[in-house]
Amino acid sequence: MKTIVPNWNVPPHIQAFTTTREGGVSLPPFESFNLGDHVEDDKSAVKTNRTLLVEKFNLPHFPLFLTQTHSTRVITLPYEGNDLEADAVYTNQPNQVCLVMTADCLPVLFTNKQGTEVAAAHAGWRGLCDGVLEETVKCFQSAPEEIIAWFGPAIGPNAFQVGKEVIEQFMAFDPIAETAFRPDPNEVGKYLGNLYQIATQRLNKLGITQIYGGEHCTFTEKESFFSY
């Protein structure tokens, strides 16, 4: 089972990783380590993969799987409620697992320097635009300069194609977002966007400057990652 471990400078007791599509039991086109039950994969295969996740990485308990809707809602763990529609998870308690699922969307992991607060956010372009990262950071008691972030694999700046309306939505929040887009040389009227750059801009505006990751492209590395 292949994973990617963040290249960030955090306390050793903070365990973080992102899985790839290798090492599970799902059949094509979901081969093989698909953890999402919202796609048309066999439910028993997804259940097996989730069990493998817990066993392989010695997780302290079965993690909470969110119903992700490109929202800005953050759930704080431990959570006893039934409403799982959210796109980020935060905790300041030990032995909690913050988990989000992504394909082309951007996964962002957070911790403070002391390793007493952690979070994970699912940032598709809609959630990123609407403020899911900002809402996640609001949960932290630590000051922004004490927070460290890592960008997991997402669709890269040479593959994320959008229309002018998407750029305008980002610019409505902050005009600097325009610098994260460039005309697509292969299609008139379309643009290529850099989710990593936009997320960096958003976090920098909050005062978070210790940011790692952002070197993968799920669209071009389809052997390793799921992509639409």
Annotated model-derived regions:
Residues M1-Y228:
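Active-site microenvironment for binding and transforming phosphate-containing groups
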